[in-house]
Amino acid sequence: MNTGGGQYTDFPAVETHGGQFISYDIFGSLFEITSKYRPPIIPIGRGAYGIVCSVLDTETNELVAMKKIANAFDNHMDAKRTLREIKLLRHLDHENIIAIRDVVPPPLRRQFSDVYISTELMDTDLHQIIRSNQSLSEEHCQYFLYQLLRGLKYIHSANIIHRDLKPSNLLLNANCDLKICDFGLARPTSENDFMTEYVVTRWYRAPELLLNSSDYTAAIDVWSVGCIFMELMNRKPLFPGKDHVHQMRLLTELLGTPTESDLGFTHNEDAKRYIRQLPNFPRQPLAKLFSHVNPMAIDLVDRMLTFDPNRRITVEQALNHQYLAKLHDPNDEPICQKPFSFEFEQQPLDEEQIKEMIYQEAIALNPTYG
């Protein structure tokens, strides 16, 4: 999240519901939150879902990022995604994962249509940094990689696959602390039906996902980490595919056309046929192409960008790699004590049920509003 977005301007504020809520007019968009939140209120981001502002939580005296998801229940998939994200963030507790602070209850239960979620406030994200002209030392890049793997170790230990790791989902603050966000696409590690509801950003997508393999594993996140780290070192995306086919082409041109033994992981005959008709590219030596990158870093990336997910390095193994030796501390890389349960998604949920479940999350965090 980038705070470059706004400076505090006086937004009209009106107390509502007997002073329990305050309604702000942010550039014509209504922002109605509980009265513990006070100015300065600063718009810091805009997305397809709505608007994000930083605002002061007077109970903790902390500035938080407040995201408004307007008409959150209009689209069934989006509503499920919001519920999933809230439940996941409430379950996860780790220094390298964005912490949820609040789900604001609606003033009137029967008129519940917008969802407000507050999280820790961060200064920027990795996408902004990569695109900026801010210089990054190798130590910076190494430290970002270490924190990303440290957070991912915890996520995978909770039986969760993130599925959408990319630079804009890695938030940073001025101390170079990195926190993983955006769990709306996360999935259980042991689930076989392929979720097509959202398009994961193509550039960071593992080959098994490009090939529509339905039994993908946590290894897809490791592939994304390899792509992100190389983008950090080169200041440009490693595989900026224009479409599915182009993406696969870029992968094979750099990493070589997969051999028969690389394809053992997929039972999809169409995928195998597609690979077999590709031109036969040899694997390019990454160390030669990226001679400015530490050879030990290249060795680690090589192990992350391995075609066969069964042979790809795991997060735990990556943390143990020599390149991260001076940061790695096995006593300070915690795992999640309790696996996350995706059970709430097993039964088909209608709009009202999702609304009720999000309402219950809000009330759990704000018992006096129940």
Curated annotation (Swiss-Prot):
Keyword field: ATP-binding, Cytoplasm, Hypersensitive response, Kinase, Nucleotide-binding, Nucleus, Phosphoprotein, Plant defense, Serine/threonine-protein kinase, Stress response, Transferase
Location in the cell: Cytoplasm; Nucleus; Cytoplasm, Cell cortex
Gene3D superfamilies, per database record: Phosphorylase Kinase, domain 1, Transferase(Phosphotransferase) domain 1
Induction trigger: By touch, cold, salinity stress and ozone.
InterPro entries according to UniProt: Kinase-like_dom_sf (IPR011009), MAP_kinase (IPR050117), MAP_kinase_CS (IPR003527), Prot_kinase_dom (IPR000719), Protein_kinase_ATP_BS (IPR017441), Ser/Thr_kinase_AS (IPR008271)
Activation/inhibition comment: Activated by threonine and tyrosine phosphorylation. Activated by MAP kinase kinases MKK4, MKK5, MKK7 and MKK9. Activated in response to hydrogen peroxide, ozone, salt stress and flagellin bacterial elicitor. Triggered by Agrobacterium upon T-DNA transfer. Repressed by DSPTP1B/MKP2-mediated dephosphorylation.
Residue(s) carrying Phosphothreonine: T196, T201
GO biological process, one term: protein phosphorylation
Protein name: Mitogen-activated protein kinase 3
Organism: Arabidopsis thaliana (Mouse-ear cress)
Gene that encodes the chain: MPK3
